Amino acid sequence: VHNPYSTPGGWGFSDVNTMNPDVDDTTAALRAIRQAAAKETALRHAWDRANQWLFSMQNDDGGFAAFEKNVSSRFWRYLPIEGAEFLLMDPSTADLTGRTLEYFGTFAGLTKDQRAVSRAVDWLLSHQERNGSWYGRWGICYIYGTWAAITGLTAVGVPAHHPALQKAVRWLLSIQNDDGGWGESCKSDGAKTYVPLGDSTPVHTAWALDALVAAAERPTPEMKAGFRALFRLLHHPDWTASYPVGQGMADAFYIHYHSYRYIFPLLALAHYEQKFGPLDD
């Protein structure tokens, strides 16, 4: 609606939604077709159109939102509508901006030297929390946002020794549980501050590990403890395996994505082995 002059080219949330594309699902689809698009003309056209649409969705502030462009007026917050901030606004967020940067760097071969990418990097760096974390709008919550930001920034060439990344790493390590894993309560998004769950979840642990791997120059004891915790959680699943880590509206609507407990641990382990070799512990 707010980007009417762009050529359609995105993908939507679900296999039957062809009317409402969003940034995150578009980058997910582009990741999936990248190799085939290099060989098949029809897919190459889809790849090109989707990338053009993706760039057209960058907000004026440099970040990326989910469904709309430049819908971030604070006016909506003052309407007497419960949840107006989540229902009527679609501002730039750390999770969408970070995941888009990760796509640009890892799958599209772009770096922070490109202007659009540089603007997104600047937006992320200017929206880091004082404690080093980032708030994630569509997941739970600060672990999720910090994972998206770290992996996005490193993918486009921000060095691991950058002060913002090292501050984020220190924050992640400061909230690591005694069992080696990570877990965050859904209460975080309503409180607008990190609230520990009290137990580790496989998804939060995988997100934290993936972020640490991206920002590390070598394996660390904390990283290996995290993988040991992750393997325990996967081999002996309990209630934490189905704890919701997706968010629709703070304090009201949460989502359990059944595939997350498999996808993100696999990604974290694959990224570790690609960077450091086989996990020897």
Q: Where are the model-predicted features located?
A:
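Preference for long, amphipathic alpha-helical scaffolds in soluble/luminal domains
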Residues: 1-281
